[in-house]
Curated annotation (Swiss-Prot):
Belongs to the AATF family. The modification Phosphoserine is found at S31, S36, S37. It is found in: Nucleus, Nucleolus. The gene is bfr2. This is Protein bfr2. It comes from Schizosaccharomyces pombe (strain 972 / ATCC 24843). Residues 1-10, 19-34, 43-57 have a biased composition (Basic and acidic residues). Residues 93-106 have a biased composition (Acidic residues). Signal peptide: none annotated. InterPro entries: AATF, AATF/Bfr2, AATF_C. Keywords: Nucleus, Phosphoprotein. Pfam families: AATF-Che1, TRAUB. Residues 1-141 are annotated as: Disordered. Disulfide bonds: none annotated. GO terms for biological process: maturation of SSU-rRNA from tricistronic rRNA transcript (SSU-rRNA, 5.8S rRNA, LSU-rRNA).
Length: 452
């Protein structure tokens, strides 16, 4: 920037519309040389780069605007006058005139539209009307959907309540079964002793028979009531004149009739629940022909094929191991009791999570597992060694003691490259040597005497 004369400076101060200047332009004028040197230093490392032209997007200029959008210069007085005029409230007539002008402008704009634009606008308006009318037409369908969802949620809630009731009923049934099984386990000792003392109860047969018949009658009546509640039709072949069976033949006939009446319902119920259990467990089709994966009815029929052998096994007195004869007067259900006891223990082992049970299972597995013993490693034929674990958090001990003189001398001799003697005798000899040397220096000064 060149030097400005006083006349030009005064003229610029009196000008109401002074020329705008960039305050940073002065700094740029003085920093041209520095920038050029910095640019040269920056380009030193990029001399081997390939020259690339500037992007077209960067060189693209802004579109040419209409001259009416360009601004014009104004003075501060005109700006204040225009602001005061705009702040004043307009009269109602002026507002009406402005509204009329706006309406005229809008009508003129509509007249300038083409026919295609007008048709497109009309179609859009029709679409908006149709879209606004759609919810009204579909309100019934939405209500049906909402009602259906509400019914579905109610069904899910009721099914969840039913499943909860079934679970509680099953839990109560298992508790009742456990109590009956516990009672049977407690009675096993007494039942086993009855076999050995059967010959001593000859005089009490009548009383025992009457009590047994009464118990069977109550049991048969309970079975009938349960079958009626389950909707099973009972086959009755007895005479209507007799209320309860008295003889053993009548009791056996009544029990057979109840079994025949229950047979069809029993098979259907067992098959239904067996299929549900198989579906939950996910048994594959390749294993369905195995004995354990067949239908429960088929498994029962297969187990009852040798019914005669099963009955004969219940007529053996196991209290006498030497006696293998069949006694029709006894009934020994030891095998059935052992199977029940095994199932009971397995269920307790599966359901229990106590530490004692887990510890007992671990001990049992250790006993069953065979130890891997090398028989050829005896008599020193093979070296036996044990690999120790790696040391963790280990550090050699540090002795906190004072260094002796020898160690200090070694340190200084290694650092300074000369031998030093730090003992008291060495210090005395060193001082005496220094004194003798000083005396020699004082005495021999080429004939000059320091005193006299």
């Amino acid at each position: 920037m060149g030097k400005v004369s006083l006349k030009d400076e005064l003229a610029g101060m009196l000008n109401p519309q002074p020329q705008e200047r960039d305050p940073e332009a002065l700094e740029d004028a003085f920093s041209d040389r520095e920038d050029s040197s910095e640019e040269e230093n920056d380009t030193l490392g990029r001399e081997h780069y390939v020259d690339v032209s500037e992007s077209k997007l960067r060189s693209k200029q802004a579109p040419q605007l209409d001259p009416k959008f360009k601004g014009r210069k104004t003075s501060r007085q005109e700006l204040l006058n225009s602001g005061s005029l705009n702040s004043q409230s307009s009269s109602p007539s002026e507002e009406e005139d402005s509204e009329e002008d706006e309406n005229d402008a809008v009508s003129e704009d509509h007249e300038n539209f083409s026919s295609s634009e007008a048709s497109s606008i009309s179609e859009e308006n029709e679409d908006d009307d149709q879209s606004s009318a759609i919810p009204e037409k579909d309100m019934d369908r939405l209500k049906k959907i909402i009602n259906g969802e509400k019914k579905l949620s109610d069904q899910i809630r009721t099914s969840a309540l039913e499943d909860m009731k079934k679970g509680l009923a099953l839990k109560e049934q298992m508790r009742f079964y456990d109590n009956v099984l516990d009672t049977r386990i407690r009675l096993q000792k007494g039942c086993s002793q009855l076999l050995s003392s059967s010959n001593q109860l000859q005089g009490d047969k009548v009383e025992a028979r009457d009590g047994l018949v009464s118990f069977i009658q109550h049991t048969l009546q309970l079975r009938k009531n349960l079958l009626i509640d389950s909707g099973v039709e009972i086959l009755d072949s007895r005479s209507k004149r007799k209320e309860n069976p008295v003889s053993l033949e009548e009791i056996a006939l009544e029990m057979n009739n109840l079994d025949d009446s229950l047979n069809e319902w029993k098979n259907d119920t067992l098959t239904k629940w067996h299929n549900r259990v198989q579906a939950v467990q996910g048994i594959s089709q390749s294993n369905k022909f195995k004995a354990l994966n067949q239908s429960i009815v088929q498994q029962i029929e297969n187990s009852m094929i040798n019914k005669k052998d099963l009955v004969e096994r219940t007529r053996i007195d196991y209290s006498d191991p030497n006696n293998k004869t069949f006694n029709p007067e006894i009934y020994n259900d030891t095998d059935f009791y052992q199977s029940l006891l095994k199932d009971f223990i397995n269920s307790r082992m599966a359901d229990s999570t106590r530490d004692g049970t887990v510890r007992w299972m671990a001990t049992k597995k250790q006993k069953q597992k065979k130890e891997n013993v090398d028989t050829k490693a005896s008599k020193g034929r093979k070296i036996r060694y044990h690999v120790h674990d790696k040391l963790q958090n280990f550090m050699a001990p540090i002795e906190v003691t004072v260094w002796p003189d020898e160690q200090t001398e070694d340190l200084f001799s290694s650092l300074l490259g000369q031998q030093l003697d730090l003992s008291e005798t060495a210090n005395d000899t060193n001082t005496s040597n220094f004194v003798e040397k000083d005396d020699e220096l004082i005495s021999s000064n080429d004939g000059f005497s320091l005193f006299g």
